[in-house]
Protein backbone atom coordinates (compact mmCIF):
# COMPACT_ATOMS: atom_id res chain seq x y z
CA UNK A 1 0.00 0.00 0.00
CA UNK A 2 1.18 3.50 -0.83
CA UNK A 3 2.34 5.43 2.23
CA UNK A 4 1.13 9.01 2.52
CA UNK A 5 3.09 11.32 4.81
CA UNK A 6 1.14 12.02 8.00
CA UNK A 7 1.48 15.56 9.39
CA UNK A 8 -0.10 16.90 12.56
CA UNK A 9 -0.78 20.55 13.29
CA UNK A 10 -0.91 21.34 17.00
CA UNK A 11 -0.48 24.30 19.31
CA UNK A 12 -2.05 26.23 22.14
CA UNK A 13 -5.46 27.89 22.13
CA UNK A 14 -5.90 30.51 19.36
CA UNK A 15 -2.36 30.02 18.08
CA UNK A 16 -3.50 29.71 14.44
CA UNK A 17 -3.77 25.94 13.97
CA UNK A 18 -6.97 26.06 11.94
CA UNK A 19 -5.65 28.82 9.68
CA UNK A 20 -2.53 26.73 9.02
CA UNK A 21 -4.68 23.72 8.13
CA UNK A 22 -6.72 25.81 5.71
CA UNK A 23 -3.52 26.70 3.86
CA UNK A 24 -2.59 23.02 3.59
CA UNK A 25 -6.07 22.26 2.28
CA UNK A 26 -5.88 25.03 -0.32
CA UNK A 27 -2.59 23.51 -1.49
CA UNK A 28 -4.24 20.12 -2.01
CA UNK A 29 -3.62 18.22 1.22
CA UNK A 30 -6.21 15.92 2.79
CA UNK A 31 -7.08 17.73 6.03
CA UNK A 32 -9.04 16.55 9.07
CA UNK A 33 -9.80 18.23 12.38
CA UNK A 34 -9.98 16.42 15.72
CA UNK A 35 -12.46 19.00 17.03
CA UNK A 36 -14.74 18.64 14.01
CA UNK A 37 -14.60 14.85 14.30
CA UNK A 38 -15.56 14.92 17.99
CA UNK A 39 -18.48 17.24 17.25
CA UNK A 40 -19.66 15.02 14.40
CA UNK A 41 -20.25 11.95 16.56
CA UNK A 42 -21.60 13.77 19.61
CA UNK A 43 -25.17 12.68 18.97
CA UNK A 44 -27.36 11.75 21.97
CA UNK A 45 -28.77 8.43 20.74
CA UNK A 46 -25.47 6.89 19.63
CA UNK A 47 -23.20 4.65 21.69
CA UNK A 48 -20.80 7.54 22.35
CA UNK A 49 -23.64 9.93 23.05
CA UNK A 50 -25.16 7.65 25.68
CA UNK A 51 -21.80 7.36 27.43
CA UNK A 52 -21.51 11.15 27.53
CA UNK A 53 -25.02 11.46 28.99
CA UNK A 54 -24.22 8.82 31.60
CA UNK A 55 -21.17 10.85 32.60
CA UNK A 56 -22.55 14.39 32.49
CA UNK A 57 -26.29 14.00 32.92
CA UNK A 58 -29.26 14.40 30.59
CA UNK A 59 -29.37 18.17 31.08
CA UNK A 60 -26.53 18.57 28.55
CA UNK A 61 -29.06 17.62 25.85
CA UNK A 62 -31.32 20.45 24.67
CA UNK A 63 -33.96 19.96 21.96
CA UNK A 64 -32.54 16.56 21.05
CA UNK A 65 -28.94 17.68 20.61
CA UNK A 66 -25.93 18.17 22.83
CA UNK A 67 -25.54 21.73 24.08
CA UNK A 68 -21.86 22.68 23.79
CA UNK A 69 -22.18 25.46 26.36
CA UNK A 70 -23.84 23.14 28.87
CA UNK A 71 -21.06 20.59 28.42
CA UNK A 72 -18.39 23.27 28.77
CA UNK A 73 -20.01 24.63 31.94
CA UNK A 74 -19.78 21.18 33.52
CA UNK A 75 -16.32 20.06 32.48
CA UNK A 76 -14.09 23.11 32.38
CA UNK A 77 -14.21 23.60 36.13
CA UNK A 78 -14.35 19.91 37.03
CA UNK A 79 -11.19 18.02 36.15
CA UNK A 80 -12.74 14.62 36.93
CA UNK A 81 -15.59 15.15 34.48
CA UNK A 82 -13.22 16.63 31.89
CA UNK A 83 -10.91 13.63 32.09
CA UNK A 84 -13.90 11.32 31.86
CA UNK A 85 -15.19 13.09 28.76
CA UNK A 86 -11.77 13.02 27.12
CA UNK A 87 -11.44 9.30 27.90
CA UNK A 88 -14.66 8.74 25.94
CA UNK A 89 -13.92 11.02 23.00
CA UNK A 90 -10.19 10.81 22.31
CA UNK A 91 -9.95 7.10 21.38
CA UNK A 92 -12.84 7.55 18.95
CA UNK A 93 -11.27 10.66 17.44
CA UNK A 94 -7.97 8.84 16.90
CA UNK A 95 -9.77 5.89 15.33
CA UNK A 96 -11.58 8.12 12.86
CA UNK A 97 -8.41 10.06 12.02
CA UNK A 98 -6.75 6.76 11.12
CA UNK A 99 -9.77 5.70 9.06
CA UNK A 100 -9.59 9.00 7.19
CA UNK A 101 -5.88 8.45 6.59
CA UNK A 102 -6.57 5.12 4.90
CA UNK A 103 -9.37 6.74 2.91
CA UNK A 104 -6.99 9.44 1.68
CA UNK A 105 -4.60 6.75 0.46
CA UNK A 106 -7.40 4.93 -1.37
CA UNK A 107 -8.46 8.17 -3.03
CA UNK A 108 -4.90 8.57 -4.26
CA UNK A 109 -5.13 12.27 -5.10
CA UNK A 110 -3.42 13.92 -2.15
CA UNK A 111 0.21 14.93 -1.58
CA UNK A 112 -0.08 14.97 2.24
CA UNK A 113 -2.38 13.92 5.06
CA UNK A 114 -2.77 16.67 7.67
CA UNK A 115 -4.62 16.43 10.99
CA UNK A 116 -5.29 19.30 13.36
CA UNK A 117 -5.00 17.82 16.86
CA UNK A 118 -4.94 20.50 19.58
CA UNK A 119 -4.17 18.04 22.41
CA UNK A 120 -1.73 15.94 20.40
CA UNK A 121 0.92 15.64 23.11
CA UNK A 122 -1.55 15.59 25.96
CA UNK A 123 -3.16 12.39 24.60
CA UNK A 124 0.21 10.89 23.60
CA UNK A 125 -0.67 10.64 19.91
CA UNK A 126 2.35 12.34 18.34
CA UNK A 127 4.22 9.12 17.50
CA UNK A 128 1.55 8.11 14.98
CA UNK A 129 2.54 11.04 12.77
CA UNK A 130 5.60 11.39 10.57
CA UNK A 131 5.97 15.10 11.30
CA UNK A 132 4.50 17.54 13.82
CA UNK A 133 4.13 21.27 13.26
CA UNK A 134 3.75 23.34 16.42
CA UNK A 135 2.03 26.67 15.74
CA UNK A 136 2.92 29.26 18.36
CA UNK A 137 1.95 32.82 19.23
CA UNK A 138 2.55 35.08 22.20
CA UNK A 139 0.03 34.70 25.00
CA UNK A 140 -1.30 38.25 24.80
CA UNK A 141 -1.95 37.83 21.06
CA UNK A 142 -3.68 34.49 21.60
CA UNK A 143 -5.79 35.92 24.40
CA UNK A 144 -6.93 38.81 22.20
CA UNK A 145 -7.74 36.46 19.30
CA UNK A 146 -9.72 34.15 21.57
CA UNK A 147 -11.77 36.92 23.16
CA UNK A 148 -12.47 38.60 19.81
CA UNK A 149 -13.49 35.37 18.08
CA UNK A 150 -15.58 33.81 20.86
CA UNK A 151 -16.79 36.77 22.89
CA UNK A 152 -15.65 34.92 26.00
CA UNK A 153 -13.73 36.31 28.95
CA UNK A 154 -10.04 36.42 29.76
CA UNK A 155 -10.77 33.99 32.62
CA UNK A 156 -12.27 31.52 30.14
CA UNK A 157 -9.08 31.76 28.11
CA UNK A 158 -6.95 30.95 31.15
CA UNK A 159 -9.16 28.03 32.16
CA UNK A 160 -9.07 26.48 28.70
CA UNK A 161 -5.33 26.97 28.43
CA UNK A 162 -4.84 25.00 31.63
CA UNK A 163 -5.66 21.83 29.66
CA UNK A 164 -2.57 22.21 27.48
CA UNK A 165 0.89 20.83 28.14
CA UNK A 166 3.65 23.28 29.04
CA UNK A 167 4.92 24.94 25.88
CA UNK A 168 8.56 24.09 26.65
CA UNK A 169 7.70 20.39 26.59
CA UNK A 170 6.00 20.80 23.23
CA UNK A 171 8.95 22.71 21.81
CA UNK A 172 11.24 19.85 22.78
CA UNK A 173 9.14 17.34 20.84
CA UNK A 174 7.93 19.21 17.74
CA UNK A 175 9.63 18.72 14.38
CA UNK A 176 8.82 22.21 13.12
CA UNK A 177 7.87 25.37 15.01
CA UNK A 178 5.89 28.07 13.20
CA UNK A 179 5.59 31.44 14.91
CA UNK A 180 2.30 33.18 14.25
CA UNK A 181 2.62 36.60 15.86
CA UNK A 182 2.18 38.48 12.59
CA UNK A 183 -0.34 38.64 9.77
CA UNK A 184 -2.30 35.86 8.10
CA UNK A 185 -0.25 36.45 4.96
CA UNK A 186 2.97 35.79 6.87
CA UNK A 187 1.54 32.57 8.31
CA UNK A 188 0.41 31.45 4.85
CA UNK A 189 3.91 31.99 3.46
CA UNK A 190 5.48 29.91 6.22
CA UNK A 191 3.04 27.04 5.75
CA UNK A 192 3.48 27.10 1.98
CA UNK A 193 7.25 26.84 2.40
CA UNK A 194 6.87 23.82 4.66
CA UNK A 195 4.31 22.22 2.34
CA UNK A 196 6.70 22.34 -0.62
CA UNK A 197 9.61 21.20 1.54
CA UNK A 198 7.62 18.13 2.55
CA UNK A 199 6.58 17.43 -1.04
CA UNK A 200 10.19 17.70 -2.11
CA UNK A 201 11.24 15.18 0.51
CA UNK A 202 8.86 12.50 -0.77
UniProtKB/Swiss-Prot annotation:
Keyword list, A-Z: ATP-binding, Coenzyme A biosynthesis, Cytoplasm, Kinase, Nucleotide-binding, Transferase
> Which cellular compartments is it found in?
Cytoplasm
* Biological process, per Gene Ontology: coenzyme A biosynthetic process
Binding-site residues for ATP, renumbered to this chain: 14-19
Specify where it is mainly localized.
cytoplasm
Q: What class of enzyme is it?
A: transferase
GO molecular function per UniProt? ATP binding; dephospho-CoA kinase activity
Its pathway, per UniProt, is: Cofactor biosynthesis; coenzyme A biosynthesis; CoA from (R)-pantothenate: step 5/5
Domain of life, per UniProt, equals Bacteria
Every DPCK domain range:
6-202
State a GO cellular component annotated for this protein: cytoplasm
Catalytic activity from the UniProt record: 3'-dephospho-CoA + ATP = ADP + CoA + H(+)
Give the EC number. 2.7.1.24
Looking up InterPro entries in the UniProt record yields: Depp_CoAkinase, P-loop_NTPase
Coiled coil, from the record? none
Q: Does the keyword Kinase apply?
A: yes
Relate the protein's function as given in its record. Catalyzes the phosphorylation of the 3'-hydroxyl group of dephosphocoenzyme A to form coenzyme A.
Q: Which HAMAP family does its entry note?
A: Dephospho_CoA_kinase (MF_00376)
The UniProt similarity line reads: Belongs to the CoaE family.
NCBIfam families listed in its UniProt record? dephospho-CoA kinase (TIGR00152)
State the name under which the record lists this protein.
Dephospho-CoA kinase
**Native species:** Chlamydia pneumoniae
Name the gene behind this protein: coaE
Amino acid sequence: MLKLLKVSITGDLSSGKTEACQVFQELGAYVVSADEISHSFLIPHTRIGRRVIDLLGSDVVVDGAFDAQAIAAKVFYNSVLLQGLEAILHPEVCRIIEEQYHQSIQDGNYPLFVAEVPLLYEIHYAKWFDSVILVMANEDIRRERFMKKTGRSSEDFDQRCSRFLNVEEKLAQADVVVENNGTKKELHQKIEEYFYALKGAL
